[in-house]
Amino acid sequence: MYQDFESELSWAMRHMPRTRAAVAALPDLHGVRLACNMHLDLKMAPLVAGLLDKGAAIFLTTCNPTTVQNDVVAWLERRGAQAYAWRDMNAGEWSESFDRALAWRPTHLCEMGADLTTRLHQSPNGPQIVAGLEATGSGISRLNGVAPRYPIFNWDDLPVKEGLHNRHMVGLTAWHTFFQTTHLTLHEKRVLVIGYGLVGQGTAAAARAYGGQVMVAEIDPARALQARYDGWQVVDLASAVAQADVIATATGAKNVLSAQHLQQAQDGVFILNVGHVAEEIDVGFLKSLPHHEPMPYVNAYQLNE
């Protein structure tokens, strides 16, 4: 555990009063076995710790191996949670984590992406789930093809989730991460935002606020029209890729930025995904290319010799 973890944890606890208040208002949770498939980063620690304090038994898996903070997982395990998750676990290990979570026989599920529910409905011998929670639009889309055998509360549609988290926080934190990782700003850069749902809207607005020259690509005619009415330059994805200095995907759909698109991008373009599904970008194609890490957490891929 790195030296400053306890300080960062204390900071997060202090500055998440609404989370603390919400957990404090819950009834006694003894007897509840909750399997959580979510981002296991610092901001989740106060929530999970509070649920443990209320008596819930908890099993932790991750919805995205690249966002796991191992120190957070270790701290929650010491508090009593069980977990099968670590940063950059491979595809086989990640898939196994879902099987382990369900073999633990949970009574309730809390998910970001519906991985556990999807896996459960592929097996006739899974645990008897009382109810579930789903936090993402991507997960809700997956559930539409599953026909769950138990009630699932869609908290992606809550006004506070839509209007605050999706519309504002995702875009802000995405660009903050970009600045901290690259040591660059968006000034004098043409930024292409792909997708104009709530996350895309917030990503575009934050990019403009931070100095970017923003273009929006959106295939849904109604959303594209909304983007025009909001004052954005709406562009065709295939032609705009070659013009962009920074490309941000925000759709929740797979393979939006394909190998063909990537081959059209200009030299030095930055590509990032702010949607839930990492495969919005054809990562498999990128990994097949020669690449190196010029900065921590920045991968450079060589398309042509």
Can you say where each PLM-predicted feature lies in the sequence?
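Glycine/serine-rich phosphate-binding loop and adjoining beta1-alpha1 elements at the start
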Residues: M1-V23, L29, L60-K189
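Gly/Ser/Thr-rich loops at beta-strand to alpha-helix junctions
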Residues: N37-M44, N64-V68, A114-L116, L198-V199
